[in-house]
UniProtKB/Swiss-Prot annotation:
Listed name of the protein: Ribonuclease 3
GO molecular function: double-stranded RNA binding; metal ion binding; ribonuclease III activity; rRNA binding
Organism whose genome encodes this protein: Chlorobium luteolum (strain DSM 273 / BCRC 81028 / 2530)
Domain DRBM, chain residue ranges per copy: 188-257
Tagged with keyword Magnesium: yes
Family named by the database record: Belongs to the ribonuclease III family.
Xref: InterPro entries: dsRBD_dom (IPR014720), RNase_III (IPR011907), RNase_III_dom (IPR000999), RNase_III_sf (IPR036389)
Length: 276
């Protein structure tokens, strides 16, 4: 059976897609786009072409040989994405209740959020859509983009395995600026610590990595936070951001105790912290 990739490449519309889409500029080669996700490593183009094939292609009379869309990969990717995000939240919030973790996950794994991550990748311009379909509407549709992101996740899992798809999710979701807003709210101890130091006219907190232990893919980071040269707290976690949050949480606890008179040893009150 001829690979889907070859079939798509031979279609007239595939080589003559519009040169630009609203706000996206000229789309690069689909092959180059896929390879760019993994720093040029060899990939199964067949699998990724399927992940980016919209269901309208299956019904396109100009391409009767195309019988598969990305819907099955979307189904798989939804589960893989849910697993990786659930595992991350479980580790990041060891005291979080089932309800709290579910609430965080719902903010991350939903159509609107996933469509935003898809837009960051310019996924819309790479979708393979039926010639008779409303291409511009489909390429910018929230549900279509979310589905494509899930399908891409499923393709990465089948092609590269769990570690590779976890790395992809970390880069595209967990390390994105929008992610912290989804899981932080009142638990953003770093923001609380900054607000506290500013209100007492102190220098901003400084985070220092004290140690990195373990294998490359399972490192544990210990980070210390200080202000004006005085240690305020430290935290240990599998990710630097999480260790910083734990250090800031400990620092806030110490500072709050200092303000109420319950001062722990080696933890000065804010006024004392600012002295030379």
């Amino acid at each position: 059976m001829e690979p889907l990739w070859h079939k798509l490449s031979a279609l007239p519309f595939f080589s003559s897609r519009p040169e630009k889409w609203e706000g996206s500029g000229a789309p690069p080669s689909l092959t180059a786009f896929i390879r760019s996700l993994f720093k040029g490593k060899a990939l199964s183009l067949e699998l990724y072409a399927t992940a980016l094939t919209h269901r309208s292609m299956v019904h396109d009379t100009t391409a009767p040989e195309i019988t598969r869309s990305n819907q099955r990969l979307e189904f798989l990717g939804d589960s893989v994405l849910g697993l990786i995000i659930s595992e991350y939240l479980y580790r990041r919030f060891p005291e979080g209740t089932e309800g709290e973790l579910s609430s965080y996950r719902a903010k991350i794994v939903n159509g609107k959020s996933l469509a935003g991550f898809a837009r960051n990748l310019d996924l819309g311009i790479h979708l393979i859509i039926g010639e008779s379909a409303d291409q511009q509407r489909i390429r910018t549709s929230t549900s279509t983009l979310a589905d494509a992101f899930e399908a891409l996740t499923g393709a990465i899992y089948l092609d590269r395995g769990l570690d590779a798809v976890r790395e992809f999710i970390e880069e595209q979701i967990i390390d994105s600026p929008a992610f912290e807003a989804m899981v932080s709210t009142e638990n953003n101890h770093k923001s609380r610590l900054i607000e506290h130091t500013q209100s007492h006219q102190l220098p901003p907190p400084v985070y220092t990595v004290l140690s990195e232990e373990g294998a490359e893919h399972e490192k544990t980071f210990t980070i210390e936070v200080s202000c004006n040269g005085r240690r305020l707290g430290r935290g240990t976690a599998l990710r630097k951001k999480d260790a910083e949050q734990l250090a800031a949480e400990e620092a806030m606890g110490a500072l709050e105790r200092a303000l109420t008179g319950d001062v722990a040893e080696d933890t000065p009150a804010p006024e004392e912290t600012g002295r030379g």
